[in-house]
Amino acid sequence: GTTVGKWESTVTDNFFPYVQTSETGNHVGVRYVALTDETGFGLMAAATETMEFSALHYTAEELDRAVHPYELQAEADTTLRLNAIQLGVGGDDGWTRLVTHEQYRPHAPVYRYGFILGAITSDDDATALARSWQTSVAAK
């Protein structure tokens, strides 16, 4: 096992400007993610088990089209991606098309995961809210 942590960041800080643009900012083993504005109002996703997520000011298509970070224009909108698992970009770096190492490849033929989406406000305790959502799903 490992220690569970609670982390805070900004959408802007989730982007890393690799020399050659690629997907970035993916978080794994996540129980919930809350995206809020400066007033604390926003959207929360709570996984029924765990999930992966990224939150960026760019879509996957925009990242794929750009060769270098300076070609990207950050949008005010946030693109939230929720995944069960990703293969990743592969290899030992982000700029060559090497195959992902065997130990990092997903092997199950089918993956299933669930999550609950809902609003969150500054009055909510995100951890307690996520637990209550997860408990209500588990009871069904």
Model-predicted regions and their roles:
Residues G1-K140:
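Beta-strand/loop-rich accessory regions of lumenal/periplasmic or secreted enzymes
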